[in-house]
Amino acid sequence: ASNGVILITTKANNRSTSKGLEVRYNLSYAQEKISSVPNYQDTYMQGSNQVYNGGYIGNWGQPFPSQVDAINAQYGTNYTQSVVSSSLSAFYPDGTAPHPLVGISRNYSQQQYFPDLLIREGYSFGSDGIFVNGTGDHIVDPTNAAVFLGVPVVLKAHDNVGGFFQTGSLMENSLNVSSSSDKASVNFTLSNSSNDGIIPNQGINRTALGLGINSTLDNGLYIQGSVNYVNTAQKSPPSGASYNNDYGGGSGGSVYGRLFYLPRNFDLNGYPYTNPVTGGNTFYRALDNPRWLVENNQFTSDVNRVFGNLTLSYDLTDWLTVMARGGFNQYTDQQSDFREKGGNTFNTGSYGEWTVGNREIDMNFLLQIDKELSPDLRLSGTIGHNVNERST
């Protein structure tokens, strides 16, 4: 599923339609879901070389505890359900591991913010946020399991991808009012579409106004024209194409890049993702949590577009017609990019905004000839001049 812009041009009403006033209203609603996700395996967990590693990206570790017996029977291997050393087995029963947000070396700095996720026996936090023992001495040795290890978490596969996306919705409303007579017609259109995307905090809203006329005056002058205004406002977290290695880099990466490469045993929808004190990012690696990304980093675009055309035509004789035809198209796009402080790359935050635009005017002056000179000879042709102006 994707979000986009549907551009509807309001045309002058066709005078061949029924005469009088006509009013039409249309309402439609649709839901959308992600079309497909990768086909994930639930046999092997986080790590490398068939060894569990709570700080690793890929799923190259040993089998999930629930799969150990089947794998051993099939391949003659000797995997166990334990993923920790014998010295830590008292803290972690088979099939469990230290909580990944606090129980691996890269996340010691997060321990002071999540005391409930830590095994602490006889230790506490000092005033500076560092663990101290009963005499107030700092404990900095990560081999002291009773201090620095996270609480046990059960190692099992989680549906992080399917649980992340939401059901999108598309609501469209349109009102059309038209009136026509033998020599003239008028057509007015007002429409709005609102689309909430499949990614949280992603959406687009479009409002359009259009007016068209079509008339032949008593003096023979033919007039046809339309003018349209469209406003398109959209917002989205970083959700471009996914990187295929190590998630890309920091806050600059895509939500998809963070999400699709998560270890199967990492409970994205169950673990904390926001620092309860600073509001910053919380993750098991030096990258931004996809849940934190969609809530805090956002790109916006607000496009205002005006376009239209006008044609004037007059028959000087039954074989000679003069015509003036012009059109214009102008838009401005106000964009912004917000990165909340506390992210991995943009730790102090960032904000930028800029405006892009374009204007084009096109005019044609034409003299059209269509004359029968004799039964065997006919002269047809167009003489004209074009003026085109573009600016950005």
Q: Locations of the language-model features?
A:
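A beta-strand signature from Gram-negative outer-membrane beta-barrel systems
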Residues: 1-24, 163-165, 170-172, 185, ...
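Short alpha-helical segments and helix-capping/turn motifs at coil-helix boundaries
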Residues: 5-10, 170-173, 207-210, 306-311, ...
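Outer-membrane beta-barrel channels and translocator barrels
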Residues: 13, 170, 181-182, 216-218, ...
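Outer-membrane beta-barrel architecture
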Residues: 24, 174-178, 189, 212, ...
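Short Pro/Gly-enriched beta-strand edge/turn motifs at strand-loop
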Residues: 154-160
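An active-site-proximal structural segment forming one wall of the substrate-binding cleft
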Residues: 320
